[in-house]
Amino acid sequence: MNSGTLIFVRKGDFCIIKSEDVYYMNVLFPNFYRNSHFDVSKDFLLDIREFIERREFDKLSLIAEDIRKNYENYKDKEVEEVEIVKKELI
């Protein structure tokens, strides 16, 4: 299991976890399973460094929305759950 530092949270949408030199996006999927009221979060390894360095969090929100709408297109970037070991919000 990978682990990292929580660096950004947009409640009800996504969070960003940094592990060494890579960034993971943890995306919240409301009602992921059909006929279920449970929310599920999934982690994705994405090339989002530039967005983070430029503080373009609205663009990251659009990426999270696209992941939810087109989950099948992102399955190859999905990783095992990333454990958050500390919190250093930017």
Residue ranges and their predicted role:
Residues 1-90:
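Extended, alpha-helix-rich binding/interface surfaces that flank or overlap catalytic cores
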